[in-house]
């Protein structure tokens, strides 16, 4: 994702930059005026935006948190159909620290630290990221392990 797209983060606790704006209250008039090409937030927030006709150009990032289930296939399909851009999942800790992130090959979630778990796929990923990952079908196991 280089260069950084104009991104609206619809959750508190993130750092803003010139191209990344944080909207802790979710989608607001201010967020709409920002005209993001990418949005990031919890699946519940993203679902509320699916009927607004937003024209995104880059990606949707769905946050899941420790103790929560992974992004459902139904939500993934809904976001793809509604926004017309790729959908990526990021699994975050309580302080919004990145624990695992979906790669561009959509081959699963690459973990940011090694848990030594035998369930991690340590084979080369099509995206080129050498970090071990949970394959797409096993992401709920990752959520349980990170909890």
List PLM regions with ranges.
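Active-site glycine/GP-rich loop and adjacent strand/helix microenvironment
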Residues: 1-147
């Amino acid at each position: 994702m280089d260069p950084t797209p104009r991104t609206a983060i619809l959750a508190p606790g993130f750092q803003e930059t010139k191209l990344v704006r944080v909207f802790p209250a979710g989608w607001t008039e201010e967020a709409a005026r920002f005209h993001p090409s990418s949005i990031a937030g919890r699946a519940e927030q993203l679902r509320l935006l699916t009927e607004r006709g937003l024209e995104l150009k880059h990606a949707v990032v769905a946050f899941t948190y420790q103790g929560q289930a992974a992004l459902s296939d139904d939500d993934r399909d809904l976001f793809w159909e509604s926004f017309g851009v790729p959908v990526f999942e990021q699994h975050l800790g309580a302080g919004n620290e990145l624990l695992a992130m979906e790669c561009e090959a959509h081959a699963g979630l690459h973990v940011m630290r090694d848990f030594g778990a035998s369930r991690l796929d340590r084979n080369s990923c099509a995206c080129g990221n050498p970090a071990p990952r949970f394959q797409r079908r096993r992401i709920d196991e990752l959520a349980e392990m990170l909890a």
